[in-house]
């Protein structure tokens, strides 16, 4: 997907990028490739592939109408090089973005990226989701939590749901259909007073399969969750 094709798809969805926004995406691509030589950020470095499989893929929740340009508080868990939240922030500057990542080198990259892109309303924290999820500064404070190819839902739910306000949403982006995964996650979702409201398969413009799953938080999370770092993965609910 060329940058021009990317812009055109957005126009078809009623979003016309300003010159500043186009430049932000160009700068994002440049910094991603530059920094990828120092630290492992992505296996995808070809420009057209980055625009398709990182930028376009990241804004799927916007293109499908699940996120609008309002002062939403969004937490991105395990964002790595900033996906999906930074492309969404470029598109919709009104949203407030927080990223938690377990690798400090990636946090350093994100700080430089945000500075170069002149983004405000972005916050980056180094650490484990399990630890932050028990911190009252972060717990039950977000409208939306996003996670792109982070973990299977049985694990992901415990890592993310505690951060949400009641009626907040987890938006999980994955490369494949999620039906079996969601069956395995039924107990975890019930334990965390949450339920699946959207499970949608779709395709990227090149035909690659993708899935978006949205989970809504119905009641406050029991205090014992999330359990200590590493436990959700070793002993899923």
UniProtKB/Swiss-Prot annotation:
Primary residence: cytoplasm
Chain positions covered by the region annotation Disordered: 216-237
Family in the record: Belongs to the methyltransferase superfamily. RNA methyltransferase RsmG family.
Keywords, ordered alphabetically: Cytoplasm, Methyltransferase, rRNA processing, S-adenosyl-L-methionine, Transferase
InterPro entries documented for this protein: rRNA_ssu_MeTfrase_G (IPR003682), SAM-dependent_MTases_sf (IPR029063)
Residue runs in coiled coils: none
This protein's name: Ribosomal RNA small subunit methyltransferase G
UniProt-listed Enzyme Commission number(s): 2.1.1.-
HAMAP family to which the protein is assigned, alphabetical: 16SrRNA_methyltr_G (MF_00074)
Function according to Swiss-Prot or TrEMBL: Specifically methylates the N7 position of a guanine in 16S rRNA.
SUPFAM superfamilies linked to this entry: S-adenosyl-L-methionine-dependent methyltransferases (SSF53335)
Binding locations of S-adenosyl-L-methionine: 78, 83, 129-130, 148
GO CC entries: cytosol
GO molecular function, one term: rRNA (guanine-N7-)-methyltransferase activity
Entry's localization field: Cytoplasm
């Amino acid at each position: 997907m060329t940058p021009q094709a990317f812009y055109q798809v957005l126009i078809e969805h009623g979003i016309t990028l300003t010159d500043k926004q186009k430049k932000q995406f160009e700068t994002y691509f440049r910094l991603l490739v530059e920094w990828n030589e120092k630290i492992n950020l992505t296996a995808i470095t070809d420009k057209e592939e980055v625009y398709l499989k990182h930028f376009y893929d990241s804004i799927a929740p916007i293109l499908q109408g699940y996120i609008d340009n309002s002062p939403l508080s969004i937490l991105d868990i395990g964002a790595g090089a900033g996906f999906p939240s930074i492309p969404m922030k470029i598109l919709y500057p009104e949203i407030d973005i927080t990223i938690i990542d377990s690798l400090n080198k990636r946090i350093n990259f994100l700080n430089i990226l945000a500075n170069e892109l002149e983004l405000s309303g972005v916050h980056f924290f180094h650490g484990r989701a399990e630890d932050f999820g028990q911190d009252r500064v972060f717990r039950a404070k977000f409208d939306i939590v996003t996670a792109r190819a982070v973990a299977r839902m049985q694990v992901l739910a415990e890592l993310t749901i505690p951060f949400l306000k009641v009626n907040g949403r987890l938006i999980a982006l994955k490369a494949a259909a999620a039906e079996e995964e969601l069956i395995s996650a039924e107990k975890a979702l019930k334990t965390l007073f949450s339920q699946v409201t959207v499970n949608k398969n779709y395709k990227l413009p090149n035909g690659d399969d993708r899935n978006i799953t949205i989970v809504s938080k119905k009641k406050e999370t029991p205090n014992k969750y999330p359990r200590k770092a590493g436990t959700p993965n070793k002993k899923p609910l």
